[in-house]
């Protein structure tokens, strides 16, 4: 990957807010987290859900919004439908190629411990002499975190305490009730795994964009290889400076757009909220907001190995996406960039489509000497292309 040459350009930028305000373009912290926190408090005050609060407060992140966003497509029927209808397809995270993308993480042992404690108390396990009160207390205070961060004894961990409850080392045999406890843990583990899968699948739909410039468009070959069918597809530039015609849809889209964060660790969901959600226990309004926030942060957090994409994501609730059949109206298309390996028939189809919709088209070509695309790309002269093609056909018929 080539290094971008520094650009020396003086522009006096201003902000409507103080630089300590998250709404300012000069804010040094994670503005998106501050914005989400503000939207949560607003939602609690107004007694509305988090997404509605985000849609109402989209203007507070105006200074952070890019002027354009790019999306790479393979050449197929679904991609062409997005161009024809000026919409984007909202995908389910379970369909993503990267298994770590939008993966929901929680402390499994904490969940199992809460389930087991509730069960043992409900079934009067101490009275039935399955375990003593001291053992129940030890289970309640057992450590469930990462072993690397544990400073105490190994015998205080959840797995060790459960083993002690189920097995008598002196008699070298299983204790009374061990089968019952093992069976309970087995089914709760299945419930935990299915619960997280359900939460990931049934809450939020996602579509992705790249916030890039001309340099990255022509030099970041991974984007073309991964998402544009090995350069046989195309890239669409959307103009965010021109609002969507429907003001409600405009607010919904701008409110749902957020930049991705990159790091080495995933977001860990709250143990109590996950416990209540999986066991169908009603959450308080605040707990639901916090769970929604954690889900949202999980869906915009990716491995640092993907940082070059500079990705933005549109997040919308599943029930909203169903209303639109997952095809959400988006900002006007500013330009289409055609991959350097696109087949001629496909290229001509895009030419016709772009001409009909009055969209600029650029043909990308390989650089002669570098591992990149030509940076000096020109707008395709569609009328001249088809005129020349017709003249050639007429000559061949003579």
Task: Please state what every model-predicted region is.
Residues 2-398:
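Partner-binding and oligomerization surfaces adjacent to conserved cores of proteins
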